[in-house]
Amino acid sequence: MIKKAVVGLSGGVDSSVAAWILKEQGYDVTGLFMKNWHDTTGLLQSDCHWEDDLMFAEMVAKKLQIPFHQVDLSDEYRQRVVEYMFAEYEKGRTPNPDVLCNREIKFDSFAVEARKLGGDFVATGHYCRKDEIKPGNKTIYRLLAGKDHNKDQSYFLCQVSQEQLASALFPIGELTKPEVREIAQKLGLATAQRKDSQGICFVGKVHLPTFLQQKLEAKHGNIVEIVEKETRSVFPDIAEGLPEQTISDESLSQITEPCNFTPSSGHIIGTHNGAHFFTIGQRKGMNIGGHKEALFVIGSDVEENIVYVGEGQSHPGLNRKGLFIRSEDIHWIRRDLRMETGECRDYQVRIRYRQPLQSARMFCRHKGMYIVFDKLQRGIAPGQFAAWYDGDELMGSGVIDR
């Protein structure tokens, strides 16, 4: 029996080629475009809006001679992704809307719409792969990095479940980006040379403070510079390498704790319009001169409305040895291999998209997971996702608490 695959046609080259591949493989293919955002508040003028994406998606469906539908999921997107973003930024955290979009929209709300069209599978243009193993009578799905490690997007799917993976297809996971564009060019697809989308998933490139001011009001506060040579006592002296597996909980807490800056740790050098508009590692948006090197955000206090900065990329305030994830925020894709309380395991971890995998040791405790890296990590930001891998396989992830 021919299986039906509903492809999320986004108007980009990746989903276009994904649809063609599935058709070549014998699937009954339908294209489904989802409209998730109408508001242009904060959008940069040069960015394309959803009308352009819809036009290109329709052109591809016509060229491939597949049925085409569209669905408006903007209410779901606002409630389940955008509202979460606002809430996290208000707490002084830095969310990743792309990860949430995949978990809550593409492989949930969109999948529901795909099933209404008779779809057995939901296909996307993600650069990642899926396979399955069958220990005993049980089927377990594995999420793997894409063949093109420069474009690997498995990180964005770090929160999907076994149930979501069961009906997911990633047709371009074995291809590189140049190969995808070459196929599109040979097929004469209108999307062949279209630029990749950037910025917030389904919203686009935005001026973040303007976008956030839809819900978060501007509040003037101080920017405090932490000068390394004057405050060395603030920065812990942490050795390189992985800690012993028998390390105490107290030591784990100490080496994963961020620096505790106070106004007395430095001096005021300027003002800002709201601490919740800044994230760890940010260097733009402060408009402060008089320094040899760029200033970077190394901390913030949203309650006191203070932003802490340090000069230069080598400032120790940018680097941390580890992080902590609360137990309720830990997600295992491979539930059969989840760690138990008291267990220690070595994985490769990344804390942002396209970051090279980092050697780390993970410690599962009653309150949550401590992740300690072999080398110091730059820009660990609460609210972001840490994802852990065993080789090419993404095992699980969690929201960074501190």
Q: Where are the regions a protein language model picked out?
A:
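ATP-dependent adenylation/nucleotidyltransferase module used to activate substrates
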Residues: 1-159, 169, 177-180, 185-186, ...
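AMP-forming adenylation/ATP pyrophosphatase catalytic core
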Residues: 123-128, 134-402
